[in-house]
Amino acid sequence: IGAEYMHISDPVEKKWFRERMEKKENQLHFTSSGKKSILNKLIQAESFEKFLAVKFVGTKRFGIDGGESLIPSLEQIIKRGGQLGVKEVKIGMPHRGRLNVLANLLQKSYKRIFNEFVGDYSSAKDSTGDVKYHLGASSNREFDGNLVHISLTDNPSHLEAVNPVVLGQTRAKQFFHKDIKRQKVIPVLIHGDAAFAGQGVVAECFAMSGLKGHNTGGTIHIIVNNQIGFTTSPRFARSSPYPSDIAKMVEAPILHVNADDPEAVVHCARIATEFRQKFNRDVVIDMICYRRFGHNEGDEPSFTQPMMYEKIRQHPTTLN
């Protein structure tokens, strides 16, 4: 784990973050059951993608292969959030990994997801005009006796366009919950590395994040940094060292973490949730991973990134 927090001007926030990262009692530590639940989520995530790859060969699904640690980290945000008073989590994300999140986090039935693959819909109301990796869902999850409502917002193909929608929904929900402290409803936005650095709407949302009329009490951002945007390498996609550098405009702390260490990713998710609930400010997790297959499952990535994909082919999965 690498942390960027020295750009924060508030000494209280800076001290909290330093102690949260460096104090011995705050170090990475999981109980046996905690480790098992992380492993369980990784098995679910990887098995889901492998099943789809075998059953629906070459069909677009925009799998999370290589970034499976996203699933246990989202689970941790909901679990820790529930302990800290969160009643509702609003999630916005692109198509990469969406089906996995629907199945393994929101517990959308496998039957409905597979029906969407074969084009068999049970009713005319089933959003039949849209592709399966644009659809949202909502469900209730219970952890440690805390019931948390999770909803994943529908989105178009336009990357990051869902961000202001999620923030607006969050703000509205806080109004209806009479959530003046902005502790009961939290937004979680998941991004790709190229889109986070490249799309102007990201900067616009940061610019409005502290304004009285638009503030949602802080967003947890997770960048699924697979080090490639369609076929574009990072050095051709941005001028800054990290995709997360845009977040420094609002002095958001940034956690860089290796996605092949799922315990570290979950630890970062815990820190991010605690920071957001304590200081009501944005926080960013830069989850550095890779994309095992092409941009979609019909692409051959080694045409444009031969050396990268030679290494990826030899690289074991997170589970292995």
Language model region names:
Residues Y242-C268, E310, H315-N320:
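Conserved thiamine diphosphate
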Residues F196, P262-A264, R291:
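Acidic, metal-coordinating catalytic cores used for nucleic-acid/nucleotide bond scission
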Residues L211, I246, F275:
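Hydrophobic/aromatic ligand-binding patch that stacks against planar heteroaromatic rings
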Residues M93, H191-G192, I223-N226, N258-D261, ...:
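Active-site proximal loops enriched in glycine and acidic residues that flank catalytic Cys/His/Asp
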Residues I1-V201, F206-T219, N225-R235, S239, ...:
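Conserved internal helical-beta-strand scaffold that buttresses enzyme catalytic cores
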Residues L255, E263, A269-T273, Q277-K278, ...:
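Functional cores that coordinate and move charged inorganic groups
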Residues I1, S109, K278-N320:
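Glycine/aspartate-rich loop-and-adjacent alpha/beta segment that forms the canonical ThDP
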